[in-house]
């Protein structure tokens, strides 16, 4: 076995050789800092325009450690060391932190958090679109405790609205935009207990089609929850698990079609080819359901049947932006979370890189003069990377040392808990004996669990566009939709608004500027 001291010595030599020549010159760093300072000084000219459009990107489980690791991966995919790379979200001028706890949970789940950042109120874990007065799985605590979302506020203001996700369209994050449910797992009536059904509660897929009937764009997975039980799936005809689940016999795709005016162009699609051949100018309503359940991981995607997140976002914006009153679009990179839960860091990080690609595409189709874009996460994960790795070390590679306890190597990426806990012959598994670069490799964890857990630390909030400066410090998570509504002059945020000028800005004047900067807690 190689001596740990020899490994460290080799690592030191390699580290010195990996420093790019330009970075050895102090002028490189000074010039870079001066450019950053110049940009920061320009931010003193605040953008107080009305946000005609609002786009919210939600990286499910995209904690700060995931953002950093995704940044390195993005650079390495372009054959760079990686650490110096800038994600699209890194370019946003304003950054805040969001406190993610649920009303009854120190470490949150994705349902209670979605209610916070979409509806503006904190809620109990496992519940969507309801206040903390609703208890999980108790249908009879729902009525009277429903809360509406920024998607509803935007639709009521005449804007077009859309939902794009890589999970099921009735999963926790998107469901808080339109549903009111005591349990996030009530995907269809097949997943609901008899008591809840008898008390009149509706499943989330049903609510998607009935609560806000004119959502302009809906894209993601979740086909099977829309069809009667045992109905064969259009793509996976021989797969019993892909068949319809509904006990009430409803075909919710037909329901969706029936609610659309005949003079409007409505399209239901189920594969990538259909999506990319659409003419957005001839689409008023779009329902795209590309998988029976969640969509495929980016690394596993079928390029014929499965669109990427960025492809869905481009089409969604092309459809929504036709509305002269603007739009609200919720985009979820939902499978970042799933990759982490499975201990598959490579899957999770490639999902994060794809979401960042979608952020870039959205930026190229919109202007920060009239579009507020917010990028954040619902919660973090117990995901970390370290081990004194040298510059440019593969983010999925080994640390440059051996454990001083069991004398075995370890990967830079590790989890605090999860399915990667493995004991071989009474000892920690020797990772040099396995393919730790495999797409589905499960990184080692300290505590054995079938599913890795969320983390409880704050998450980042990146913002650009009108009123983005109002996301500026450490906030409660439910503050986020209030800022978006204020910027767009929708919902309860109309008092400060005035007819827009040709540039789309708020009426000028010190009084209105002062109001824009006044603590929002006073206004709500």
From Swiss-Prot:
It comes from the Eukaryota. Changing residue 489 to S: In HOPS; reduces alkaline phosphatase activity. Changing residue 327 to L: In HOPS and HPPI. Changing residue 378 to V: In HOPS; strongly reduced alkaline phosphatase activity. Phosphatase activity is specifically inhibited by 5-((5-chloro-2-methoxyphenyl)sulfonamido)nicotinamide (SBI-425). Its cofactor is Mg(2+); Zn(2+); Ca(2+). SUPFAM superfamilies: Alkaline phosphatase-like (SSF53649). Changing residue 334 to D: In HOPS; abolished alkaline phosphatase activity. Changing residue 391 to C: In HOPS; moderate; 4-10% of alkaline phosphatase activity. Changing residue 406 to G: In HOPS; 15% of activity. InterPro entries: Alkaline_phosphatase, Alkaline_phosphatase_AS, Alkaline_phosphatase_core_sf. Changing residue 297 to D: In HOPS; 1.3% of wild-type activity. Zn(2+) 2 binds at residues 337, 341, 454. Changing residue 456 to R: In HPPI and HOPS; strongly reduced alkaline phosphatase activity. Changing residue 152 to H: In HOPS; benign; lethal form. Changing residue 162 to V: In HOPS; severe; 1% of activity. Glycans are attached at residues 140, 230, 271, 303, 430. Mg(2+) binds at residues 60, 173, 332. Changing residue 450 to C: In HOPS; severe; 4% of activity. Changing residue 71 to P: In HOPS; abolished alkaline phosphatase activity. It is found in: Cell membrane; Extracellular vesicle membrane; Mitochondrion membrane; Mitochondrion intermembrane space. Residues 502-524 form a propeptide. Its EC number is 3.1.3.1, 3.9.1.1. Belongs to the alkaline phosphatase family. Alkaline phosphatase that metabolizes various phosphate compounds and plays a key role in skeletal mineralization and adaptive thermogenesis. Has broad substrate specificity and can hydrolyze a considerable variety of compounds: however, only a few substrates, such as diphosphate (inorganic pyrophosphate; PPi), pyridoxal 5'-phosphate (PLP) and N-phosphocreatine are natural substrates. This is Alkaline phosphatase, tissue-nonspecific isozyme.
């Amino acid at each position: 076995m190689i001596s740990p001291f020899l490994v460290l010595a080799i690592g030191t030599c390699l580290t010195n050789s990996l420093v790019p020549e330009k970075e050895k010159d102090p002028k490189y760093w000074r010039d870079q800092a001066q450019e950053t300072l110049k940009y920061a000084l320009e931010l003193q000219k605040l953008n107080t325009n009305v946000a005609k459009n609002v786009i919210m990107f939600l990286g499910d489980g995209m904690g700060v450690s995931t953002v950093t690791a995704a940044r390195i991966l993005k650079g390495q995919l372009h054959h760079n060391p990686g650490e110096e790379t800038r994600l699209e979200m890194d370019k946003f001028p304003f950054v805040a932190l969001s406190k993610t706890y649920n009303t009854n949970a120190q470490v949150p789940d994705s349902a209670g958090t979605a209610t916070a950042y979409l509806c503006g109120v904190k809620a109990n874990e496992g519940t969507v679109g309801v206040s903390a007065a609703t208890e999980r799985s108790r249908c009879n605590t729902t009525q009277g405790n429903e809360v509406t979302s920024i998607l509803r506020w935007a639709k009521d203001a005449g804007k077009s609205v859309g939902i794009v996700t890589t999970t099921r369209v009735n999963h926790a994050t998107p469901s808080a935009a339109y549903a009111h449910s005591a349990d996030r797992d009530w995907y269809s009536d097949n997943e609901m207990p008899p008591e809840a059904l008898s008390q009149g509660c509706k499943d989330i897929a049903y609510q998607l089609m009935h609560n806000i009937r004119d959502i302009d764009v809906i894209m993601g997975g979740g086909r099977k929850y829309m069809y009667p039980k045992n109905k064969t799936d259009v793509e996976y005809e021989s797969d019993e698990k892909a068949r319809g689940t509904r006990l009430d016999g409803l075909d919710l795709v037909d329901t969706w079609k029936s609610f659309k005016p005949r003079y409007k162009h409505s399209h239901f699609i189920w594969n990538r080819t259909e999506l990319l051949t659409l003419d957005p100018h001839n689409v008023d309503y779009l329902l795209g359901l590309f998988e029976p359940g969640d969509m495929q991981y980016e690394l596993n995607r079928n390029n014929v049947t499965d669109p990427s997140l960025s492809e869905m976002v481009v089409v969604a914006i092309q459809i929504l932006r036709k509305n002269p009153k603007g739009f609200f679009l919720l985009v979820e990179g939902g499978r970042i979370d799933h990759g982490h839960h499975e201990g598959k860091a490579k899957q999770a990080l490639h999902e994060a890189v794809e979401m960042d690609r979608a952020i870039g595409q959205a930026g190229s189709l919109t202007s920060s003069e009239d579009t507020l874009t917010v990028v954040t996460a619902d919660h973090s994960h117990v995901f970390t990377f370290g081990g004194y790795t040298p510059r440019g070390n593969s983010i999925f590679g080994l640390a440059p040392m051996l454990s001083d306890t069991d004398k075995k190597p370890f990967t830079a990426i590790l989890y605090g808990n999860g399915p990667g806990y493995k004991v071989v012959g009474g000892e920690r598994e020797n990772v040099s004996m396995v393919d730790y670069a495999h797409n589905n490799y499960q990184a080692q964890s300290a505590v054995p669990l079938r599913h890795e857990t969320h983390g409880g630390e704050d998450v980042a909030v990146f913002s650009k566009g009108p009123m983005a400066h109002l996301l500026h410090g450490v906030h409660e998570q439910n503050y986020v939709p209030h800022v978006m509504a204020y910027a767009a002059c929708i919902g309860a945020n109309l008092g400060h608004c005035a007819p827009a000028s040709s540039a789309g800005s708020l009426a000028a004047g010190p009084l209105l500027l002062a109001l824009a900067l006044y603590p929002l807690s006073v206004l709500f």
